[in-house]
Curated annotation (Swiss-Prot):
Monomer. InterPro entries: GH28_Enzymes, Glyco_hydro_28, PbH1, Pectin_lyas_fold, Pectin_lyase_fold/virulence. It is an enzyme of class 3 (hydrolase). Involved in maceration and soft-rotting of plant tissue. This is Endo-polygalacturonase. Transmembrane segments: none annotated. Belongs to the glycosyl hydrolase 28 family. It comes from the Bacteria. It catalyses: (1,4-alpha-D-galacturonosyl)n+m + H2O = (1,4-alpha-D-galacturonosyl)n + (1,4-alpha-D-galacturonosyl)m. PANTHER family: PECTIN LYASE-RELATED, PLASMIN AND FIBRONECTIN-BINDING PROTEIN A. The active site is at 249 (proton donor), 277. Its EC number is 3.2.1.15. One of its GO terms (molecular function) is polygalacturonase activity.
Length: 402
């Protein structure tokens, strides 16, 4: 695999990815193939009115295995407040149609005056779309979901992203809604849909089993703080494939939290990342196992392949495979960092069985291997890792095997 004019040039074997079904590289224990959109139970037509209650009623009345289809009418935009997906029911957004979040903080608050403010909590907003304890639900395109993160709120003098910037300055937390929040669910699908301008994280899959994002496009400015692309948290059996992700934070961030399930069996296959903070594991790493990242192009991310944590959130990371990755204009192509934010705590990183194979960075960068806080020296295996001659290495308490 090589990089050419920002596009893929694949070998014959990878040229057959249209036939992909649970690639040999996969760590996801499921057999995963390209999803198919379900048939619709009803079709809604867009007009100029706010459609929250109309869409929610249609979702509640839709039979399992079916989808509510959003199509163009007198308008191509559905304006809506927070929505909840029932179990077994999906949302299908037609070509050229946008489901747009209302730009009103009050609509998202989960307690009086809790959303659209900066405080020490940061949990005062409902997500735009929530799925909790669902099985076989999903969101399908080829339409778009727009979080309006950069638009001034009607009931505030600032945008969601302004709040995030203000929180950073004040060392507090912004109360801004995530775009899609999936909790304790099984076999959730995101297919052929575009996600733009999220106020906060775009997609979170938390405490679940079975998540597929396929042909998903995420595009949010690099300056939009805390706008992670896709974050699997304390979950298992995840596939992110054939997707294109550009954000203002981690393109993908795999996390595992204390007191919750381990995160395991993750496949990140045949993707392209633009701006963002890279393909990350952490900073919550209290049990991450069996991760495969294969056939990835990264252009303009601040970091490339990164495992990050510190004493406040570290734990076991084991069985991580990176292969066939090409990077360009990536400041730090490879990062292993046990002192990510220098936070204090009693947790010790225990990271092992980490392999980098057939990795190319085409522009100058810095490789950071910092095992300062590790339980024991971290061993990483590097095979056919190609960097430019002017790239540099920073190594502390890490052993590199070839």
């Amino acid at each position: 695999m090589e990089y050419q004019s920002g596009k893929r040039v694949l070998s014959l074997s990878l040229g057959l990815i249209g036939l992909f079904s649970a690639s040999a590289f996969a760590s996801d224990s499921r057999t995963v193939s390209e999803p198919k959109a379900p048939s619709s139970c009803t079709v809604l037509k867009a007009d100029s009115s706010t459609a929250t209650s109309t869409i929610q009623k249609a979702l509640n009345n839709c039979g399992q295995g079916k989808a509510v289809k959003l199509s163009a009418g007198s308008s191509s935009v559905f304006l809506s407040g927070p929505l909840s997906l029932p179990s077994g029911v999906s949302l299908l957004i037609d070509k050229g149609v946008t489901l747009r979040a209302v730009n009103n903080a009050k609509s998202f608050e989960n307690a009086p005056s809790s959303c659209g403010v900066v405080d020490t909590n940061g949990k005062g907003c409902d997500a735009f779309i929530t799925a909790t304890s669902t099985t076989n639900s999903g969101i399908y395109g080829p339409g778009t979901i727009d979080g309006q993160g950069g638009v001034k709120l009607q009931d505030k003098k600032v945008s969601w992203w302004d709040l995030a910037a203000d929180a950073k300055v004040k060392k507090l937390k912004q109360n801004t809604p995530r775009l899609i929040q999936i909790n304790k669910s099984k076999n959730f699908t995101l297919y052929n849909v575009s996600l733009i301008n999220s106020p906060n994280f775009h997609v979170v899959f938390s405490d679940g089993d079975g998540f597929t994002a396929w042909k998903t496009t995420i595009k949010t400015p690099s300056t939009a703080r805390n706008t992670d692309g896709i974050d699997p948290m304390s979950s298992k059996n995840i596939t992110i494939a054939h997707s294109n992700i550009s954000t203002g934070d981690d393109n993908v961030a795999i996390k595992a939290y204390k007191g919750r399930s381990e995160t395991r069996n993750i496949s990140i296959l045949h993707n392209e990342f633009g701006t963002g903070h890279g393909m990350s594991i952490g900073s919550e790493t209290m049990g991450v196992y069996n991760v495969t990242v294969d056939d990835l192009i990264m252009t303009g991310t601040t970091n490339g392949l990164r495992i990050k944590s510190d004493k406040s959130a570290a734990g076991v990371v084991n069985g991580v495979r990176y292969s066939n990755v090409v990077m360009k204009n990536v400041a730090k192509p490879i990062v292993i960092d046990t002192v990510y934010e220098k936070k204090e705590g009693s947790n010790v990183p225990d990271w092992s069985d980490i392999t980098f194979k057939d990795i190319t960075s085409q522009t100058k960068g810095v490789v950071v291997l910092n095992g300062e806080n590790a339980k024991k020296p971290i061993e990483v295996t590097m095979k056919n890792v190609k960097l430019t001659s002017d790239s540099t290495w920073q190594i502390k308490n890490v052993t590199v095997k070839k």
